[in-house]
């Protein structure tokens, strides 16, 4: 018995949780039927929902690093937040949900000062 066949059988059993679907006939019929399942299985996955919170946290962290380093950029971003109606509490909640509030609390305080000065 070929080692590659053993890997295919084990992977099929793990994927389907069904020993009957691991027979050579079942594996070959799925591949030979022309549905392209064997070559397109990765294209059918939708990982954007799983990785979306991580991407948002990374974008927030990059943005906050730029704000911390560049005061002119900070004023521009604060102006955008104010223009879009973001309150201090909403920004605190956003950073809290991403786990960034502890590290970047000073930026929220600077945003509160910006809001007070712009009114």
UniProtKB/Swiss-Prot annotation:
Carbohydrate-modified residues: 46
Placement of sequence motif RxLR-dEER: 40-77
Keyword annotations from UniProtKB, A to Z: Glycoprotein, Host cytoplasm, Host nucleus, Secreted, Signal, Virulence
Full protein name: Secreted RxLR effector protein RXLR-C04
Pfam families: RXLR (PF16810)
Organism for this UniProt entry: Plasmopara halstedii
Annotated disulfide bonds: none
Entry note about domains: The RxLR-dEER motif acts to carry the protein into the host cell cytoplasm through binding to cell surface phosphatidylinositol-3-phosphate.
Induction / repression: Expression is up-regulated in spores.
Signal peptide as annotated in the record: 1-22
Entry's localization field: Secreted; Host cytoplasm; Host nucleus
GO CC field: extracellular region; host cell cytoplasm; host cell nucleus
The keyword Ribonucleoprotein is annotated on this UniProt entry: no
Biological function: Secreted effector that suppresses pattern-triggered immunity (PTI) in plant host.
Gene3D superfamilies: 1.10.10.2460
Gene name for this UniProt entry: RXLR-C04
Family classification: Belongs to the RxLR effector family.
